């Protein structure tokens, strides 16, 4: 699939960070970015937009990204990556153990993010 058509769902409650990440992705050719700031909003966006990939923050205002991952995984096998400031090995290993495709800790370098989602 051409990356211009690839739809990425970005879930993070920090609006400024979401906009920055979306900008990085758009500059790299990923033009179709949809965002959500909570678990509830992410589930709605997921059902409405049917993304090809999801990037999930671990800490969200109405739940955590791990539970969201499990709900999304029940419905789809799209690639799902965690983006989190929680950099403890146990969190990273837990996320990967659930079946996440990657666990990227914040802060990250923009080229690293693009490389790891491609």
Label every model-predicted segment.
Residues 15-34:
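Two-component/phosphorelay signaling modules centered on CheY-like receiver
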Residues 61, 88, 106:
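The feature encodes the CheY-like receiver
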Residues 35-53:
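Acidic, metal-coordinating helix/loop segments flanking the phosphotransfer/catalytic sites
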Residues 57, 84:
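Active-site residues of response regulator receiver
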Residues 38, 64-67:
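Acidic catalytic/metal-coordinating carboxylates
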Residues 44, 66-76:
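Short amphipathic alpha-helix used as the core "switch/output" element in two-component signaling
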Residues 12, 60:
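Conserved acidic carboxylate
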């Amino acid at each position: 699939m051409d990356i211009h058509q690839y739809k990425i769902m970005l879930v993070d409650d920090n609006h400024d960070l979401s906009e920055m990440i979306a900008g990085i992705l758009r500059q790299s050719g990923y033009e179709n970015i949809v965002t959500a700031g909570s678990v509830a909003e992410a589930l709605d966006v997921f059902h409405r937009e049917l993304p090809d990939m999801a990037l999930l923050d671990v800490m969200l205002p109405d739940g955590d990204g791990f539970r969201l991952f499990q709900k999304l995984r029940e419905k789809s096998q799209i690639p799902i990556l965690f983006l989190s400031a929680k950099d403890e090995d146990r969190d990273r290993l837990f996320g990967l153990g659930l079946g996440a495709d990657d666990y990227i800790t914040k802060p990250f370098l923009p080229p690293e993010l693009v490389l790891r989602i491609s």
